[in-house]
Amino acid sequence: MKVTIFSSKDYNDKKTNFGDCILIDTGTSLVIYDCGHQKHAERVLAYMKKAGYKKADFILSHNDSDHFDGLPYLIEAGVISHVYTLLLLKEKYRKKLLQIMGNYIKDETLVKRIKTEYDNIYSLGNSVTLVDALELPSVCTGVSIIGPELDAALEAVAKHLDNREGNTLDGETIHNAICFQVKIKMDDGKHMLLCGDSAFSMVEPNLKYASYIQLPHHGKYEIAEKIFECKDSHKHIGTKYYVSDNTGTTNGGSDTLKTKDYGRDVTYTTDGDIPVGEKKSSPYVTGKSYGELIR
């Protein structure tokens, strides 16, 4: 199992927010977690060609542009089999949302609001197979969606769609707060947790599984501090942390996190691509054969 968190360090354009793009290569299947820009998408295609993958599955943590905008390019290239995403137009979710909102609005109004808020997801239309990520499915061997918990997610969405309510959870927008989280079983038997821009309350139940953690919202330090405290309280020693952040203090940002001395093992994409789980080559030369000894 190899996970690669893309960096934009070597891109010529230093002003553009290229967003997140994370590849999960099981050795037999490829899963893409977010793709925020066409530049990242082009690198995904190059990786697939080199590794011999013709198709990949895609998990969309949420529909913000810095996580979504490279996806249409990949779909047009014909390499995406399924997109795991938030599909709130399903009747079972609409009924629950209306119930949470006290039937304050009619179903037709709710449908319009969902289509407006998640227009980029539904713009994918019939071009790719969309899979309901709220059912927390297994994507392939060793890769599964494990959060957010359904009721908590729908409560948050209802708050967002009800214009009488606020649009934040734990200081994050609802779009960010309910990001889909991914659990990956690494070759050492430990697990990695990908969080997108999730709010702390949404990732907290899943921290116990993880020895490798992508810090949410590009390393936003307020969330990182809570995660550090949570792991410390459970005496989880040796956890490794990763920050996908190519824009500094914008979009959450890791600059403040860098200036604080937390004494944690944190790696940043500002220093380049981050490979996780990549096997190191042996320093020893083996396997040579010089033939039989001539007498």
Can you describe what each PLM-predicted range is?
Residues 26, 61, 198, 269-270:
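Ser/Thr-centric signal marking residues that sit
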Residues 44, 68-80, 94-103, 225-230, ...:
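Metal-dependent catalytic neighborhoods of phosphoester/phosphodiester hydrolases
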